[in-house]
Amino acid sequence: AFVPRNDQFTLLAADYSQIELRIIASISEDPGMLEAFNNGLDIHTATASRVYGIEIDEVSKDQRRNAKTVNFGIVYGISAFGLSERLNIPRGEAADIIKAYFEKYPGVRNYMDETRAFAREHGYVETLLGRRRYLKDINSRNGTVRSFAERNAINAPIQGSSADMIKIAMINIHQKLRELKLR
């Protein structure tokens, strides 16, 4: 655990709530995902409601947990096999959940398809601030190697943009602390 050096110092902890999912909602421009965030809904509960076709107040803890796994897993290219292993459900059920997810959040699917196509053509992807991640294996003939590069193509703009935003916030906080002569 971190502790302040002495009584003259205080530790500051800050967190952006669901930053990566907010970024994917923004860059994919998916209406359903944007609506959930804009209305202050819990994105995992909203996803469970959409995927399972039930009202938000009917979502169980297990359904929310499953939706949370799907929300984060989709960004990292989770397969039906991987989802079935994580959720301990049959592979067919996992495939149905992934299919329903993309039906309810088509903007996310479009983002993924367009990002892979861009990466194949240009050999890189970018964060929202233009920082590039080069993907030398994006056109590999080896399917396993290519799939890994494709997953990186999809998640690098999301994770990288998140990192960019957090670093900017840290710089702004540091400047404000110096300005106010705080330690």
Give the location of each predicted region:
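Conserved catalytic core of nucleotide polymerization and phosphodiester-bond processing enzymes
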Residues: 1-183
